[in-house]
Design a protein with these regions (language model features):
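Conserved small/polar residues in nucleotide/adenosyl-binding loops
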Residues: 1-5, 162
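Low-complexity, intrinsically disordered or signal/transmembrane-proximal segments
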Residues: 5, 10-11
Length: 228
């Protein structure tokens, strides 16, 4: 991962606190949060969001984690209006609020969810997929026939804010993820108007080998680094 430091003077990303990051998330916003059952999630920022009391959020997430972990804390606190998600089974708060009508759930198969986020980041009009044909996933969606085969048109997803969790970053905002903590983070970094990365370790620009970077700093607006 590491290489010899460069002496080139690069643009430095602004470091902010978790509370400052949470303050950029306003009531009613659409927010992407990286993570897979909490792995790779920006936990300090999520804690700050819980403290802030922000509400009526729409979350775009792979899963709703657990009531006491990851984005599930926001659902447990009833700060979320809608979730676009592939799995909710590990968080009973999600299903309880769904069944009571307090929380709107838009289920999306995991691979399709990833492609919709990727499409949003790439500026595409959507993605064609056979996944979900003939199921409730297809309800209300356009079916397009290509060479005699039907596909669902899944529209792109974008967010007001993306909150990422990274293992390592340099001061230019280049991000590295350890193992499966990568999950949805790199895709989400491309598909939001404002991107904030919470990083476990911060190094000087030039300390990360270019081939190790999974999210280039050009996508990152702010970083939340561990307190020293």
């Amino acid at each position: 991962v590491y290489k010899r430091q460069s002496k080139i003077n690069h643009h430095m990303k602004k470091l902010i606190s978790a509370a400052e990051a949470a303050g950029m998330v306003k009531d009613g916003m659409t927010v992407m949060i990286g993570g897979f059952l909490g792995n790779g999630s920006p936990h300090a920022i999520i804690d700050a969001l819980v403290e802030s009391g922000v509400k009526d959020l729409t979350l775009i997430v792979n899963d709703t984690a657990y009531p006491d972990k990851g984005c599930g804390r926001l659902i447990a606190g009833k700060q979320v209006r809608k979730v676009i998600v592939s799995h909710i089974g590990t968080n009973p708060c999600t299903s309880e609020q769904m069944n009571s009508g307090e929380l709107e759930i838009e289920f999306c198969p995991q691979g399709t969810l990833a492609e919709r986020v990727r499409s949003g980041g790439a500026g595409l009009g959507g993605v064609l997929t056979p996944v979900g044909l003939g199921t409730i996933v297809a309800e209300g969606k356009q079916i397009i026939n290509v060479d005699g085969k039907d596909y669902l048109l899944e529209k792109p997803l974008r967010a007001d804010v993306a909150l990422l969790g990274a293992s390592l970053a340099d001061r230019s905002g280049n991000l590295v993820y350890k193992g499966t903590s990568q999950n949805f983070n790199p895709l989400m970094a491309t598909a939001a108007d404002l991107v904030i990365a919470e990083v476990r370790e911060l190094v000087e620009t030039g300390a990360i080998a270019p081939e190790a970077v999974r999210t280039p700093g050009i996508f990152v607006d702010y970083m939340v680094a561990p307190a020293k």
